[in-house]
Amino acid sequence: MRSLDYAKVITKLVSFIQEKVEESNVKGVILGISGGVDSATVAYLAARAIGKEKVLGLVMPYHINRDVEDALLVCNNLGINYKVINIKSIVNEFEKNLDFELNNVSRGNIMSRTRMILLYAHANSKNYLVLGTSNRSEFLTGYFTKWGDSASDYAPLINLYKTEVWNIARILGVPNEIINKKPSAGLWEGQTDEKDLGITYKLLDEILYRLVDLKMKKENIARELNIPLNKVEYVESLIKKSEHKRKLPIGPEI
């Protein structure tokens, strides 16, 4: 992986948040806090950038589990304002009005988009910016809900790979129990990122960095990492299949 000066990266991230709040002439920032390392890291950066009193965290569970405890741990450790909104009744009401059965993925997308709506409703009422929590690994592979968790005003972590976010989280003092637990979007019980993606973040990031940033040939990546070529091809396919998710809707030129 690339070698980063994490002290400089953190300074850059903090300055970025400060600048965008000032440029946008808003009173603060809001973000969804899931109990995972990405949202925790953004919360820690935001509190450092503009002060804890200008940061609002929304904890929006569908399932009541350890993630809620971890989300509250982040809020309480930082001393930021927060609200807990259980989205189960909202999602269930939506589902009741559909004339077809939802699978886990469709329901998960509705959950993610419900959270986006709640974030923007609160942001509009308070004149806040919405901070996104997506990282580069998710962004490049399309591991996010279009118009859901990908929707934000600014995304501080969007150019950092997941393994790099873990390193930044450690430096910022994010609790170890959050850093060390298996990453999950929390869309259904037992769901984990790496199970969905079919690859560990450590290997995924090594491949992505070489494919996208270094623009290495697939055969050379496989040789350098001592992995089968089809692993590299699989990651490449994730990037290609999700291209539409990284762009605004387009139409033909007239």
Curated annotation (Swiss-Prot):
Name this protein carries in UniProt: NH(3)-dependent NAD(+) synthetase
Residues involved in Mg(2+) binding: 38, 138
SUPFAM superfamilies: Adenine nucleotide alpha hydrolases-like
Species the sequence originates in: Thermococcus sibiricus (strain DSM 12597 / MM 739)
Pathway, per record: Cofactor biosynthesis; NAD(+) biosynthesis; NAD(+) from deamido-NAD(+) (ammonia route): step 1/1
CDD domains linked to this entry: NAD_synthase
Entry EC no(s): 6.3.1.5
Coiled-coil spans in chain: none
Catalytic class of the enzyme: ligase
Keyword presence, Glycoprotein: no
Gene behind this protein: nadE
Biological processes annotated in GO: NAD biosynthetic process
Molecular function via GO: ATP binding; glutaminase activity; metal ion binding; NAD+ synthase (glutamine-hydrolyzing) activity; NAD+ synthase activity
Classification via PANTHER family: GLUTAMINE-DEPENDENT NAD(+) SYNTHETASE, NH 3 /GLUTAMINE-DEPENDENT NAD + SYNTHETASE
Residue numbers binding deamido-NAD(+): 113, 146, 153, 244-245
Record keywords: ATP-binding, Ligase, Magnesium, Metal-binding, NAD, Nucleotide-binding
One GO cellular component term noted in the UniProt record for this chain: cytoplasm
Family: Belongs to the NAD synthetase family.
Quaternary structure, from the entry: Homodimer.
Physiological role: Catalyzes the ATP-dependent amidation of deamido-NAD to form NAD. Uses ammonia as a nitrogen source.
